[in-house]
Each structure stands twice: as C-alpha cells, then as structure tokens.
Amino acid sequence: MKIRYILFLLTVAFLLGSCATPKVAYFTDLKRGTAEQVLNPLEIRVRPEDKISILVNSKDPLLMNLFNLPIISRQIGTTSGTSNSQGISGYTINKDGDIDFPVLGHIHVAGMTREEIASYIKEELVSKNLVKDPVVTVEFMNLTVSVLGEVANPGRFNIDKDKLTLLDALSMAGDLTVYGKRENVLVQREENGKKTLYQVNLNSGYDLYASPVYYLQQNDIVYVEPNSMKARQATVNGNNVRSASFWMSLASLLTTITVL
C-alpha cells in the first residue's frame, strides 16, 4: 500500500513538472501607473564601416548637385524579367572614422549621431559661404541588429531611427514565442574589439530599464533562449512526453499501481 502511494505521488509530480506553465508576462514587478527612469538613453553613433547617406537641400539646384552624390540606378531581377531601381549613393566611414565629403574634404564623423553630423556639415557650409540656406539630412544605410532564437520571425533588421530599444527589436521580430525564456534574454555587443554578453530579465522592468543594453547599438545580436518546455521537446525523452507510446506507458504504470 505504501509503495503504491509513493509511486502515485511520483507520477503526479512528474506530470505537474512536465506541464509547468512558463512565465510569459513582462514587467511583473512594476506597479501600474508608476513611472520608472530609464538609464543610459543612448543614441546610435556611427562607427567605421557604417554607411550613411547625406543629402543637402538648397533653393539653388546647382548647389544641390555640387554637394550631393549621384543617384545610382540598379537592375533588379524579377520573375517577369528585370526592373530598374534608383537609390542614393552613400558614404562608407573608413577605418579612421572619416568620410570624404564634396568640397569640404575629409570629415571625422565616427562617434557622432545623425543630428550631430547634419549640424556640423550645415555649419561648415554656412561658415565657408558655400551655401546660405542648407538643409542637411543624414540617414543610416547599412546599420542592423539581429534577433535569434525563440521569436516569431528571427532575422536581421535595419536601424532607421536614432534610438532603438531591446523591446523595439523584439517587436520587429514578432515578439517572443511561448517557448522563449523571458528571464534570460542575451545580448551580444562588440566593444573595443571584444564581444561582451549581457543578460536581461524581461519579467523584471527594473532589470530591463537599468540594463546597459536596453538601448541597442548597431551589430548587436539578441538571442532568446528556449525555456525548459522547449528544451524537453528538443530531446528524445522530451519528445516522448507528447507521443502516444509515452501515454500508453504511463497508463500501464497507473494500472500497475492500482493493482498493487
């Protein structure tokens, strides 16, 4: 009788463990209506090998042509043939952090934001009496972040704004799946030639907002680990949990317990 009772408890414990509900809610430690300060509000700053477009607008069309790179035309293959596509040429920041801008020559832009680059070029054009009324627009061209693991749509995503948060990146990837380990989201960042791995707990708003990787940088890699439920599914024994043979074996065990 005692053996049967012990086996029954072990079976129930196993079933409860295999069917445990993962923690899927975000920010469970935050109170509704309260404001939390976000640390390190970092803007994207360009680096060597980044590519940017710089467009100078003026009332004088001749000046616009002087300071703007030519529009490039490309042929794109399609199922029905080829089509032409036009785009703005860009500046690739060299290893020294410089770009070669028309008339102004070499400009050191590494470490600057889009707004700072635009402001600097505008001031140079005005101070040198080159353009009286310039409007300078700077856009990112090849800056990306990657999101991998347990998300709906993993992939590489373009950065098109000055601040990109971890939540923005996860949203672009379609959010975490139910199998995503929310308490252990990893962000890999390259800093000073070294790769650093940061851990973020999405269940905790305090942890997320205080993280140095709440604001992402170009080339960051976000990895969402699978939770224990998905890990079991990925193993042979885990797959058996959802197989007919497993349930038949379990039924046989329960029958044996009843007979004892």
What are these regions (language model features)?
Residues M1-C19:
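Sec-dependent bacterial lipoprotein signal peptides
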Residues K2-I3, C19-L260:
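Ser/Thr/Pro/Gly-biased, low-complexity, turn-/loop-rich segments
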